[in-house]
């Protein structure tokens, strides 16, 4: 035992040593000298002029936004040109993410040196950005002024302004703590270490069972590693929803740093105004990259590690679940390879960048196994169904709806067994009850905010996003940037993949050749049943289903179908079922198992490899030091008529313009404190926070009324004219939410206890 523990210690020590050795000592360090100084240092007068120009431009933008709202054109211009920016701007300045930075200025003899960290339009995000130095020593070639400033949120176009800019000879900006031990390398090492630890532990079992486990895991992990190929390039490639999910990760990280748990408002999103995405989009699993982010890992590395974890979890989940269903190791390995390297799943992860749907696909096999146990085999294993449905529910809402639909179809197909054994019905109800209890902490806020009138979803014409049956034969990805409805569906490879479809064809061929008499085993019936359900899911993604008719009927009946947005999402439901069926088609006969496995792996590698290769034939959008904007363009999850282009950083306003002076201002997450002086009469004060139910306010310790204001900003009543006062605003979740959280915690404990009892019984 000592040798085993020592081997683990040596493994992790070696990984830590590698991270230390390969840490770039100059990471997050930018130095300017000579002609480069013009890119970071500007005179104080120029900084003031830029700020004035930014204020004037924002005033015009706000006027235009109000005009659009008055004309009923709300939300028509919520797009920005640059979601991602390089750290060093092409025209000068630094684009930096949040954090503490040290600025060091080297200057020649001057009686006094001053430095001010400035960013036109973003000044409210800079703390401790002013520094002064009195030159004491004489006959010194260069004096040095060093100070630490903080960026509370991501800040672009950052410069150093000075009254004596001509005396500056060099400037160095360095992120505090960087260059000692790279957090990114530590995150990568932790992921590799976890995989190697699992393999090392498996190697300790020298029995025949242990040998088989090692063989299976080697193939499964190789499939997951191959799916990670695009992550091995130098950055993260832009996907359709990548920017939205990056802001979710940053929002959770910001909330955790400022004391929110669970995070109910993404306080960093929309220039710090806040965004209630957590009430409408499940994000339990995004706490993993958010925690990494708060440990100093770059956003790029967080996404890479998280997507690699998704691939690993998907491969292992499918292997374990298919093995549990069919009691066959080789079929489980084959299904795992097919599922992990399925073109649709890879497109979900990389091209569409739908982290929610990709996470849901981790749990689809668990739902499949749990449902099979409850309906056909051992209803006492209902906790598996509850676990799978809870995982899907905490990943993606539409996927949850699809799972419920197919569970209902499977239940109808097994109605005879359900009615013959009433305990199966009780097991289904138990799984549904535990799932609902675990998800209560999410659904209660969602229902409350939806009832309050907050926009919840983008409604699209689903009939425009359907497949033609021939598109399922597309084996290679084409234009990875395709965006038009049909172009994306047909050229991007949103299809199961030929490797999977060939396996299904082999299953049907075996069935036809053998005849009914030779296909009577339980696995035969299961594979054919999964094939039928998978084919139904594929049918729902095509124009054979009357999407056009259903989307054209009178509202609100059509709204349900239009909110599905993309019917080809049903391919995601088909893939786990078809993977198991196809694996049985390839590997049913033991005498042909080696040939079948070789063909299966070869087809998967060729088709998925080419697909992933096309994905990386462009420059990555997100790299280690890339600046990521927080102004998302989605229209949902805010009150109607919220013009996101009109949101101004640190905007404090009153009912009468020009009568308010801000004496001090501090914002920490969803908590904001400002001391203001009123020079005239004002009925209210508005603060740079988007209003959501739950905000509370005090002025000098006295509770005040909070309401929706201009552009749905937080409006506080209670300031008296001619007086100064300290306004304190914070977000407080309703009591009903806290009760729901407690109920969900109880549900999670109940689920864990049920799984443990099930395992002990097994």
What do the predicted segments below correspond to?
Residues 171-173, 727:
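Extracellular beta-strand elements of beta-rich domains used
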Residues 35-64, 70, 74-75, 617-671:
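Membrane-interface segments at or immediately adjacent to transmembrane helices
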Residues 86-100, 112, 120, 128-155, ...:
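Beta-strand-rich ligand-recognition modules
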Residues 34-53, 69-72, 78, 84-86, ...:
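Extracellular carbohydrate recognition and processing domains
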Residues 2-27, 178-620, 729-762:
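Membrane-embedded transmembrane-helix bundle of lipid-linked glycan/lipid transferases
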Residues 108-119, 164-167, 693-694:
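Extended, low-complexity, turn-rich repeat/linker tracts enriched in Gly/Pro/Ser/Thr and Asp/Glu
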Residues 158-166, 733:
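Short beta-strand-plus-loop segments that form exposed binding edges in beta-rich domains
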Residues 647-762:
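Active-site-proximal, structured, solvent-exposed surfaces of multi-pass membrane proteins
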């Amino acid at each position: 035992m000592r040798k085993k523990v020592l081997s683990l210690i040596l493994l992790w020590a070696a990984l830590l040593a590698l991270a230390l050795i390969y840490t770039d000592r100059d990471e997050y360090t930018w130095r300017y000298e000579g002609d480069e100084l013009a890119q970071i240092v500007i005179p104080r007068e120029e900084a003031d002029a830029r700020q004035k120009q930014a204020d004037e431009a924002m005033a015009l933008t706000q006027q235009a936004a109000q005009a659009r709202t008055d004309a009923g054109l709300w939300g028509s211009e919520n797009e920005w040109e640059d979601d991602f920016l390089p750290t060093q701007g092409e025209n000068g300045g630094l684009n930096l993410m949040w954090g503490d930075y040290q600025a060091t200025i080297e200057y020649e003899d001057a009686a006094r040196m001053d430095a001010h960290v400035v960013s036109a339009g973003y000044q409210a995000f800079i703390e401790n950005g002013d520094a002064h130095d009195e030159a004491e020593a004489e006959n010194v070639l260069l004096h040095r002024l060093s100070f630490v400033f903080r960026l509370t949120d991501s800040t672009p176009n950052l410069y150093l302004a000075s009254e004596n800019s001509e005396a500056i000879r060099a400037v160095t900006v360095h992120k505090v703590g960087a260059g000692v031990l790279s957090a990114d390398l530590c995150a990568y090492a932790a992921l590799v270490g976890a995989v190697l630890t699992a393999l090392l532990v498996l190697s300790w079992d020298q029995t025949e069972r242990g040998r088989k486990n090692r063989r299976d895991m080697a193939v499964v992990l190789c499939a997951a590693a191959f799916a990670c190929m695009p992550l091995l390039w130098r950055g993260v490639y832009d996907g359709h929803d990548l920017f939205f999910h990056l802001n979710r990760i940053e929002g959770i990280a910001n909330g955790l740093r400022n004391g929110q748990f669970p995070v109910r408002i993404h306080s960093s999103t929309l220039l710090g105004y806040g965004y209630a995405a957590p009430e409408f989009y499940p994000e339990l699993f995004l706490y993993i990259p958010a925690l990494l982010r708060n440990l100093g890992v770059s956003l790029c590395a967080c996404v890479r590690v998280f997507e690699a974890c998704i691939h690993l979890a998907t491969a292992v989940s499918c292997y374990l679940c298919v093995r549990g269903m069919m009691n066959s190791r080789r079929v489980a390995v084959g299904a795992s390879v097919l599922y992990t390297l399925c073109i649709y799943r890879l497109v979900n992860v990389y091209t569409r960048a739908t982290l929610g749907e990709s996470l849901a696909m981790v749990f689809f096999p668990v739902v499949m196994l749990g449902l099979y146990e409850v309906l056909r085999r051992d209803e006492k294993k209902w906790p598996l169904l509850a676990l799978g449905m809870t995982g899907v529910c905490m990943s993606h809402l539409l996927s949850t709806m699809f799972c419920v639909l197919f569970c209902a179809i499977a239940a109808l197909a097994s109605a005879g067994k359900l009615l013959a054994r009433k305990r199966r019905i009780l097991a289904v109800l138990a799984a549904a009850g535990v799932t609902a209890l675990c998800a209560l902490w999410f659904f209660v806020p969602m229902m409350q905010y939806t009832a309050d009138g907050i926009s919840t979803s983008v409604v699209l014409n689903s009939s425009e996003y359907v497949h033609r049956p021939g598109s399922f034969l597309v084996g290679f990805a084409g234009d990875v940037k395709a965006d038009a409805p049909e172009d994306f569906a047909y050229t991007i490879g949103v299809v199961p993949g030929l490797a999977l479809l060939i396996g299904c064809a082999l299953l049907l061929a075996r069935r036809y050749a053998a005849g009914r008499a030779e296909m009577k085993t339980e696995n035969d019936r299961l594979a054919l049943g999964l094939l039928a359900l998978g084919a139904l899911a594929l049918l729902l993604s095509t124009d054979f289903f009357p999407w056009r008719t259903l989307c054209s009927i009178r509202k609100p009946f059509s709204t349900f179908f239009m909110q599905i947005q993309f019917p080809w999402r049903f391919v995601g439901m088909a893939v786990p079922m078809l993977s198991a069926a196809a694996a049985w088609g390839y590997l049913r006969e033991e005498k042909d198992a080696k040939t079948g496995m070789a063909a299966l792996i070869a087809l998967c590698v060729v088709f998925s490899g080419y697909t992933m290769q096309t994905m990386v034939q462009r420059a990555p959008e997100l790299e280690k030091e890339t600046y990521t904007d927080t102004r998302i363009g989605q229209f949902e999850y805010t009150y109607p008529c919220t013009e996101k282009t009109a949101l101004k950083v640190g905007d404090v306003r009153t009912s009468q313009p020009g009568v308010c002076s801000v004496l001090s201002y501090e914002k920490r997450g969803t908590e904001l404190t400002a001391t203001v002086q009123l020079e005239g009469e004002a009925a209210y004060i508005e603060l740079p926070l988007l209003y959501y139910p739950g905000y509370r306010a005090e002025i000098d310790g006295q509770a005040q009324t909070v309401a929706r204001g201009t552009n749905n900003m937080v409006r506080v009543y209670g300031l008296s004219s001619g007086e100064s006062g300290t306004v304190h605003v914070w977000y407080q979740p309703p009591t009903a939410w806290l009760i729901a959280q407690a109920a969900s915690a109880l549900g999670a404990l109940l689920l864990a206890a049920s799984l443990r009892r099930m395992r002990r019984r097994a």
